[in-house]
């Protein structure tokens, strides 16, 4: 991806929300492993996403439907990122947040019409930027 880890991480000076490829770039910059999804490509399909209620998922239900369009996934995260959302049934990482800085990523597409709670995730990010 031609990633510059310093630019992406920004050392917390600029809040960052990575969606899909952006999530992958954030995680890769932190030393995560990216691979083809073990379940094959998922394009335009709603998936069940479970979360731990932290970061972007604050005050959301523990499970919701979100739209995915991707064939690559983060298998494990680096030292600074903490997974906080997973695909129901598979456990694939669907979201992660930085331990110290306002840096968040989601594998799914909250901006999609097929993601009913997507706007709440965007609003949570904006509130985390304050």
Feature map (PLM): residue ranges:
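Short helix/strand-capping connector loops at secondary-structure junctions
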Residues: 100-110
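Acyltransferase
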Residues: 113-130
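Catalytic beta-strand/loop cores that center a nucleophilic Ser/Cys/Thr
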Residues: 54-100
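Short histidine/acidic/glycine/proline-rich micro-motifs that form metal-
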Residues: 73, 111-113
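Cysteine-nucleophile active-site neighborhood
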Residues: 1-59, 65, 122
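Conserved hydrophobic/aromatic beta-strand scaffold that supports enzyme active sites
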Residues: 46-48, 93-95, 105
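Hydrophobic/aromatic beta-strand patches that form the interior of the parallel beta-sheet core
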Residues: 17, 35, 67, 84, ...
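Histidine-centered divalent metal-coordination motifs
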Residues: 20, 70, 109
